[in-house]
Structures are given as C-alpha cells and as structure tokens.
Amino acid sequence: MRVTDFSFELPESLIAHYPQPERSRCRLLSLEGPTGALTHGTFTDLLDKLNPGDLLVFNNTRVIPARLFGRKASGGKIEVLVERMLDDKRILAHIRASKAPKPGTELLLGDDESIHATMTARHGALFEVEFNDPRPVLDILNAIGHMPLPPYIDRPDEDADRELYQTVYSEKPGAVAAPTAGLHFDEPLLAALREKGVEMAFVTLHVGAGTFQPVRVDTIEDHIMHSEYAEVPQEVVDAVLAAKARGNRVIAVGTTSVRSLESAAQAAKSDLIEPFFGDTQIFIYPGYQYKVIDALITNFHLPESTLIMLVSAFAGYQHTMNAYKTAVEQKYRFFSYGDAMFITYNPRAISERP
C-alpha cells in the first residue's frame, strides 16, 4: 500500500486552532462500519449511541509542559521538546538548534535562563539531557515549560491551553500530546453516561512527539513506528472480558486507547487480552485483525498519517475516505482541537485494500 493512498485535500480553514467553548458541544460524524452510512450530530449524541453495560476505555495520561526554550552556554538558541521523562533528573528530548549539541554541552533554559542542564548522550534523533537542579524534572517543566501544541496549530501556546489541551480525567503525567478524542468529554457528560449504566476503564499511553512525525517511506509496510510507553492494568483486562462475556461493546476513546488495548491483546499468551506494561510500537493499517475493539471515538486525522491508516483498518478504506470527503464538504473542524467521529467496526475491513 502506498502512503499517498491515504491522502485527501484539506482546506487550511478547517484546521481548528482553538477548541469549542464547551467540550461536549463539538460536532460528531457517526460512521456505521458495516454499511458506511453516515449521520451528523453533536458529541452528546453518544448518550443515545451507547448502551448500558458498554465499556468506554479512556487514556488517562496527562500532558506535560514539554516545550522548553533557551540557549547553549556558548550562545546558540535552542528549543527542547521532551519525548519522555527518564527519571527525576533526566529527559529524552528532541533538540532544535542551528548546530546539534555534543555530549557535555551546557544548556541554559527558561525565560531567565535560570535552569541549567547538560546534554549527556545522543540516541539517534533524540538527546539525553540531565538537569542540574534539586527539583524533580516534572516540577521544572511545570515551572518553565510550554504546552506542546501540535505543529499544525499555528500559534503560540496560551495559559488557557494548560487546561484546554488536557482531558478532564487526566491523571498520570508523561504525554507530550493530548489523547484528543478525550478532550470532548466534560464532567456532566461523564456523569450522564455513568447514570445510563455505561462502564468506564482507564489505560495509560504516554503519547510521544513521534505521533506528529510524517510517514517518510512510500510504502506503508516499510514504516517503522515510534515507541511509546503503555499500561493496561488487570482491572482494565477484567472490565474488557466482562463486557465481552455479557455481550456488550468495548469502545476505545481515541487511537491511543486502541493501540494500548491491541498491544495487550497481541502480547497475551492465553486469554483474549492480558495486562501489559511496557513500550509498544504497534502499527495498525489495513489488513490488521482487530482483537478487542468494537467501536471507536476519534478526531479527524492528518492526511497520510498512521492514524488515518488505523481508522481505515477499523472501518474499511473506502468507508473511511468517503467519511473524510464528506467531513470536508460539511466543514467539520479537523485535528486536535476539532470535531469527532463515532465509528462501529466493519468486519470486512480486514480484506479491504486501497
């Protein structure tokens, strides 16, 4: 399959630079996987689409203020984007500079350059940085870091983004991008879903900056997926198996929840799914056999991205590309701060290719 098979025309005006004033008031395009039928509505329509006993699986990662600005002690300006926190003193990061720093380079970070750090090692495209500060890394990031808005949101981050670019149920710091399907859930909607009898479970996948990296090969089978840390604890496994046993659906909130659950299913030795704690490089594209997910809530993704490939593997290639064409025609808002989709599984998707 060619990367260009997953391309579509998107006017710049449809890229959302700010979220809706109310989280759950975004538009919702529903795609019936088996038939390809599309319906238009708002996000709160989920109350009618979900049944008592259905299981929603959320990603409870919390976005860290992962973008740092400063300079090398020798003078050159730098921008640091944290990929992951290694421990209380060290990070693994992307560094943008006129000349890549060498091991031993001292970095002065923050508006007042008061935070000192040292680049200690290089691992491919990533740099290991150690802070020379008594505070834990997370405290330093909270003090001087900027929210790492995606590159297609063409504006500086604002104070409001610290709340808006965060799910209301975020709990475990570590992501450098939000699991954006979850941004549409507010407390009243969550309460209404619970009252209806919808079950909820929480995985953790710390989204890395690699999620924004373009696919740089022509043939998608040649793409090497970036690695991200995921946790699928025993209580999530129990909730999934219980939902399946009673005939209810497992509904992933976002592609990161999909990748977490499917990673746990791939690693399982005996049951449908088993607990999973570790890095995953799972790459889902047409031809993949889904093992756990019955429905998916997700935002609209970039052309030629691994995420539109994941959706195509779930709903079917033709149904997915037709849904995106319709979304553009109907002026849905795209990407992280944009509108959402509710998609049910197409069992014929596994045999569909572009």
Swiss-Prot record:
Q: Name one GO biological process term.
A: tRNA wobble guanine modification
Q: Which family does the similarity line name?
A: Belongs to the QueA family.
Described purpose of this protein according to its UniProt entry: Transfers and isomerizes the ribose moiety from AdoMet to the 7-aminomethyl group of 7-deazaguanine (preQ1-tRNA) to give epoxyqueuosine (oQ-tRNA).
Keywords (alphabetical) are: Cytoplasm, Queuosine biosynthesis, S-adenosyl-L-methionine, Transferase
The protein's annotated catalytic reaction(s) are:
7-aminomethyl-7-carbaguanosine(34) in tRNA + S-adenosyl-L-methionine = epoxyqueuosine(34) in tRNA + adenine + L-methionine + 2 H(+)
GO: which molecular function terms? S-adenosylmethionine:tRNA ribosyltransferase-isomerase activity
Q: What is its EC number?
A: 2.4.99.17
The reply to whether Cytoplasm figures as a keyword in the UniProt entry is: yes
- Pathway per the UniProt entry: tRNA modification; tRNA-queuosine biosynthesis
Q: In which compartments does the protein localize?
A: Cytoplasm
Q: Name one GO cellular component term.
A: cytoplasm
Query: How is this protein named in the record?
Result: S-adenosylmethionine:tRNA ribosyltransferase-isomerase
- What Pfam families is this protein classified in? Queuosine_synth (PF02547)
Q: Which InterPro entries match?
A: QueA, QueA_dom1, QueA_dom2, QueA_sf
Subunit and interaction comment: Monomer.
Q: Does the keyword S-adenosyl-L-methionine apply?
A: yes
If you read the UniProt record, what top EC class would you report for this enzyme, in one word?
transferase
Record PANTHER family: S-ADENOSYLMETHIONINE:TRNA RIBOSYLTRANSFERASE-ISOMERASE (PTHR30307:SF0)
